[in-house]
A protein has these predicted regions:
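Long, well-structured alpha-helical subdomains associated
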Residues: 374-470
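Post-HEXXH active-site segment of zinc metalloproteases
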Residues: 341-367
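Bacterial N-terminal signal peptides
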Residues: 8-21
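Extended, compositionally biased alpha-helical segments that mediate assembly or anchoring
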Residues: 455-506
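N-terminal helix-rich structural modules
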Residues: 30-162
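Contiguous, non-catalytic segments that form substrate-binding/exosite surfaces or channel walls
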Residues: 111, 124-322
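An active-site-proximal "capping" alpha-helix that borders the catalytic cofactor pocket
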Residues: 152, 362-379
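Active-site recognition of the HExxH zinc-binding catalytic motif
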Residues: 328-342, 369, 374
Length: 506
C-alpha cells in the first residue's frame, strides 16, 4: 500500500477534510482502495432544538447499521446471494420452485419487508418488525423522542409515523408524510429502501439512513427542473405505451450536506444522491424526492472523477470535465428514476417492473437513470435551460463517469450498469480508443444518437417486463474490453471510492 498524495490534497483543500488513510491495491473496488475521509459539515446555524433532534437521529441511524449488518451476511450458515434475507444455502431455483408450488405464500415471501426462514419443510415470511425487533424498538424510541423535541409539524408527523412503521411493518403512511417535510433544514431518510443487497431475487429492502442538512439556496436553484418532469416523460424516445404519466408531480429537490449515514448507505460505493421512496403507490400519489449530497459529491469529484478524466480522455476533452456537469448528471439521474415504466401489465397481470425483472431490475434501473439523465440534460439544452454550447462538457463528464463507476466491478449494480453503457456506446461509435494517446476520443454526434438509442432499448425492455430480454441485453453489452481494462489499470493510484467518517454528534 502507498499513500495517495494528489487526491488527498485536492480533498483537503476543497472540503476542509482531513484524510485519515489512503491506500491502493490492484483489485478493482477493493475496500483498501477507498479514501477514508473525515467529513466536516457546517452546523453552526442549527438551533438548540434542531441540534438535539439531529443527535437523536444520528443514534437512530446507527440502529439501521446494526440491522444491515444482519441483512448483508447470511445468519447461521454459508453466505450466498440471498445473504441474510433468505435461509443459508438457499438457491434462486429452490426459492422459485417453492413459490410455484405454494402460490398462496408468494405475496408474503416476496414482500419487500419480510425475511424468509425455514420451518421444517416450509418457508415462512417473518416481518422485519419481528426479525429486527430489538434494533427497531430502539430506533422507534429515538424517533419518538425526536418527535417530541421538534416544533416543526411536518417533521414531528413524519418521525411519529416512522416510529409506528418500525413497530407495525407498514411504511405507506410514513412514506407519504416524508414527502411533505417542509420548513426545516433537517432532511432525514431512515428505514428499509433499496433492494440491491438482495442479489438473489432483488426484492428485499435493506435498512439505511441519511441524516442531512438542506441548503435552501442551492436547492432553489435546481428546483426549476422538476416542472419539466411531464415534458421529459413525453420526450422519451419510445412509443407512448411505454411512457408513464401516472406518477405524482410533487417531486421535491433538495441539495444537502450529509452529516451521518447508516446501514446500506455506508456499504460499498457511496451514493452522491438518492431518489425515494421506491413504493410505486407513493410515487403515483406524490412523486419522489430527490436529494443531492453536495459534500459527498464534491469529495468524489475532486478526489476521483477529476483525476480520472485526464487518464481516460484525450487532453482537449479531459479539460472539459466539470463539477457542474457531475452535479447536473446526478440531479437528472435521480429525476430519471421517476420517469419511464413503473406499474405495468404483463400478459393481463398488473405488476411492476421490479417484480418482473427480479435480480436484474436494480442494475437495469441504474443504467437507465445514468443514460436517461444525459438524455434529459440534452432536452434541457433544447429548452434553453442549460447552455447548448456546453454539450461537449456534458459528454466528457458523462464518459469519465462511466469509467469511475465501472471500477466498482460488475458485481455491483452501478458498476455493471456502467459496463453496459460502455459496451453499448462504444459499439455505436460514441467514443473510440486512440492507441497513440492510450485514451478515448468522444464523437459528439454519435454520442447523442447512442444515448437516445440506449434509453429506448432499456425502457422498452422494462415496459415489457422482459426478464429474459434484459438478461440477454446485458450479456451482450455489459463487458469491458481490453482497451477499457488497460485504461482502468492506469487508475490504481486513484481511489475507487471514499469511506466518509462523520462526527459522532453535532
Amino acid at each position: 500500500m502507498r499513500a495517495l498524495v494528489s487526491p488527498a490534497l485536492a480533498l483537503a483543500l476543497t472540503l476542509g477534510v482531513s484524510v485519515a488513510a489512503l491506500s491502493s491495491t490492484p483489485a478493482l473496488a477493493a475496500p483498501e482502495n477507498y479514501a477514508t475521509i473525515r467529513m466536516k459539515t457546517d452546523t453552526a446555524f442549527l438551533s438548540p432544538e434542531e441540534r438535539k433532534v439531529v443527535n437523536l437521529l444520528i443514534q437512530a441511524a446507527d440502529q439501521m447499521t446494526a440491522i444491515y449488518d444482519k441483512q448483508a451476511v447470511a445468519q447461521g450458515g454459508a453466505d450466498g446471494p440471498g445473504h441474510g434475507f433468505y435461509p443459508p444455502g438457499m438457491t434462486k431455483a429452490e426459492f422459485e420452485t417453492y413459490l410455484a408450488a405454494h402460490p398462496d405464500q408468494k405475496a408474503s415471501l416476496m414482500d419487500a419487508y419480510t425475511v424468509v426462514r425455514r420451518e421444517g419443510d416450509k418457508l415462512v415470511a417473518v416481518p422485519y418488525s419481528v426479525a429486527y425487533k430489538p434494533e427497531l424498538t430502539k430506533a422507534a424510541a429515538l424517533l419518538d423522542e425526536a418527535a417530541k423535541v421538534t416544533t416543526n409539524a411536518s417533521l414531528k408527523r413524519f418521525l411519529t409515523l416512522r416510529a409506528q412503521s418500525f413497530r407495525s411493518n407498514d411504511y405507506f403512511q410514513s412514506e407519504m408524510a416524508w414527502m411533505d417535510l417542509e420548513g426545516t433544514p433537517i432532511e432525514v431518510a431512515i428505514g428499509p429502501y433499496e433492494t440491491y443487497t438482495d442479489e438473489m431475487i432483488g426484492q428485499k429492502a435493506a435498512f439505511e439512513a441519511f441524516v442531512t442538512l438542506k441548503n435552501p439556496t442551492e436547492s432553489q436553484a435546481l428546483d426549476k427542473y422538476k416542472a419539466y418532469l411531464r415534458d421529459m416523460e413525453a420526450n422519451l424516445p419510445v412509443a407512448d405505451a411505454y411512457k408513464n404519466f401516472k406518477r405524482g408531480g410533487a417531486s421535491p429537490i433538495a441539495v444537502a450536506e450529509q452529516i451521518r449515514g447508516g446501514g446500506d448507505n455506508l456499504h460499498g460505493p457511496q451514493t452522491v444522491a438518492f431518489n425515494l421512496p421506491n413504493d410505486e403507490r407513493v410515487r403515483e400519489a406524490k412523486g419522489a424526492k430527490k436529494v443531492i449530497l453536495s459534500n459527498v459529491l464534491a469529495a468524489k469529484y475532486e478526489g476521483i472523477l477529476s483525476p480520472i478524466a485526464s487518464r481516460v480522455l484525450v487532453a482537449d476533452q479531459a479539460a472539459l470535465v466539470s463539477q457542474k456537469y457531475m452535479t447536473l448528471e446526478t440531479l437528472f439521474h435521480e429525476l430519471s428514476h421517476s420517469l419511464g415504466p413503473g406499474s405495468i401489465t404483463v400478459a393481463g397481470r398488473a405488476t411492476t417492473v421490479s417484480a418482473e425483472l427480479k435480480d436484474i431490475a436494480g442494475t437495469a434501473e441504474e443504467a437507465k437513470a445514468d443514460v436517461m439523465g444525459a438524455w434529459n440534460i440534452l432536452f434541457m439544452m433544447e429548452k434553453n435551460e442549460i447552455p447548448a454550447a456546453e454539450r461537449p462538457q456534458l459528454f466528457a463528464t458523462y464518459t469519465a463517469g462511466i469509467f469511475r463507476a465501472a471500477r466498482w466491478g460488475d458485481e455491483e449494480a452501478h458498476g455493471r450498469g456502467a459496463a453496459l453503457q460502455y459496451g453499448y456506446l462504444k459499439a455505436k461509435g460514441a467514443f473510440v480508443f486512440d492507441p497513440a494517446a492510450k485514451r478515448y476520443r468522444i464523437d459528439d454526434a454519435k454520442m447523442a444518437a447512442g444515448i437516445r438509442d440506449l434509453v429506448a432499448d432499456i425502457v422498452k425492455l422494462q415496459g415489457d417486463g422482459d426478464y429474459a430480454g434484459m438478461v440477454a441485453f446485458f450479456d451482450r453489452y455489459a463487458h469491458l474490453d481490453d482497451d477499457a481494462r488497460g485504461v482502468i489499470a492506469t487508475l490504481k493510484d486513484i481511489p475507487v471510492d471514499i469511506t466518509p467518517v462523520y462526527p459522532a454528534k453535532v
